[in-house]
Regions:
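Boundary/entry segment of secreted carbohydrate-active catalytic domains
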Residues: 21-56
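Positively charged n-region of N-terminal signal peptides that target proteins for export
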Residues: 1-4
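Aromatic-rich peripheral "rim/lid" segments of glycoside hydrolase catalytic domains that contact
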Residues: 42-46, 54, 257, 276-290, ...
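Substrate-binding cleft and catalytic face of glycoside hydrolase catalytic domains
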Residues: 56-175, 180-198, 204
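Hydrophobic faces of well-ordered beta-strands that scaffold small-molecule active sites
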Residues: 30-34, 65-67, 97-101, 150-154, ...
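Acidic-and-aromatic substrate-binding clefts and catalytic sites of carbohydrate-active enzymes
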Residues: 39-48, 71-81, 159-162, 202-213, ...
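C-terminal motif of bacterial Sec signal peptides marking the signal peptidase cleavage site
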Residues: 14-16
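Glycoside hydrolase catalytic-domain groove-lining segments
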Residues: 51-58, 195-198, 209-280, 292, ...
Length: 347
């Protein structure tokens, strides 16, 4: 595998060419996670006036795309090849790119951080090497195509660690040595592939103060350049019954505190509102006003806004899950007012 990585690196040094982006690195990111797009298109979903979805979003201001990567999902969607296909389209459209590496065969989140099937019998040292090789494999695949991602997440929503049970943590307890070791290994691998890439550690609940998490990460040698947060202010069932006003205010307070305490920028890596709630635009506008006033808040990505019309991915059917109800497109396949507000935001 090292020979492949060396070949790719030499090839890019010789050509020296990467896709150019519409907006400069480090500027305000107005983005969307569109990882379901290729599966939606495969299922025959069309967008407004048959316009390409990426171009549709670019036309109203999108300048960045976030794409997840699973190790080996049974359907093939969101695996490396699918991510690469979408990344090429996004790069051609002048988009800056964030890669969200889950280190799992399916969604990784605060309740699920399942070790990939192929890695199940690994000990800690072998797991570290698997994290390194998978990170390099994903990033060098992009490099070989002339794509230079601006950001990479080492794990997705990992307040409770990753690669469970080996890397599971519980507040200040649990397997912090292992979890922090995984993030440090992913960090070093990412910098090997792209020395100036911004490495993100991502947690959920933008409103929630978690001093114990970042102190433990630092104490055990975890590494990051930027903090990523998820924010779903209308999910009162997730948020202890808090109102959206409370959620937005608490998130703003926490973002400011994280920037001050850890001397690094913060990215809203995921945001979502209810698709059919007339309040959604008001909630988004309030949140955008708050975060654009924060100097070191780097941007915001809407999670899967392109979903509309009750579509759901194939893997949801056997699980008995309903369709995603926080898409931000109208019934005729056009970006809604919520997306207009997000994608026209400025700092």
């Amino acid at each position: 595998m090292k020979k492949i990585f060396l070949f790719c690196a030499v090839a890019m040094l010789l050509t020296g060419c990467y896709y150019k982006t519409d907006s400069p690195r480090g500027s305000w990111a107005r983005g969307a996670d569109i990882s379901w797009l290729s599966e939606m298109e495969h299922d025959g979903v069309k967008f407004y006036e048959n316009t390409d979805c990426i171009e549709l979003l670019r036309g109203i201001g999108m300048n960045a795309v976030r794409l997840r990567v699973w190790v080996n999902h049974s359907t093939g969607w969101s695996n490396k090849e699918d991510m690469l296909s979408l990344a090429k389209r996004a790069a051609k459209a002048g988009q800056r790119i964030m890669i969200d590496i889950h280190y799992s065969d399916f969604f990784a989140d605060p309740s699920h951080q399942t070790i990939p099937a192929a890695w199940q019998k690994y000990d800690y040292e072998t797991m570290l090497e698997a994290v390194r090789e998978h990170t390099l494999d994903v990033l060098y695949a992009l490099k070989e195509e002339g794509i230079k991602p601006e950001w990479v997440q080492i794990g997705n929503e990992t307040p409770n660690g990753m690669l469970w049970p080996m890397g599971k943590v519980d507040k200040a307890e649990g397997h912090w040595r292992e979890y922090a070791g995984f993030t440090a290994m992913g960090y070093e691998a990412a910098k090997e592939a792209f020395p100036d890439i911004t490495v993100i550690v991502h947690v959920d609940n933008a409103y929630e103060r978690r001093d114990w998490f970042w102190k433990s990460m630092e104490a055990y040698g975890g590494k990051w350049d930027m903090i990523g947060l998820s924010h779903y202010p209308m999910m009162s069932a997730w948020n202890g019954g808090k109102s959206w006003q409370e959620m937005n205010a608490l998130a703003e307070e926490n973002i400011r505190r994280l920037i001050y305490d850890w001397h690094c920028p913060v990215m809203i890596a995921e945001v979502g509102m209810f698709a059919n709630d007339p309040l959604s635009a008001t909630v988004m506008e309030d949140f955008i006003q708050r975060i654009t006033a924060i100097d070191s808040c780097a941007g915001i990505f809407y999670w899967e806004p392109e979903v509309y019309g009750g579509w759901r991915p194939a893997e949801y059917v056997p699980l008995g899950w309903g369709s995603y109800d926080m898409g931000a497109f109208t019934p005729d396949g056009k970006p809604s007012e919520v997306m207009d507000i997000l994608l026209q935001s400025k700092k």
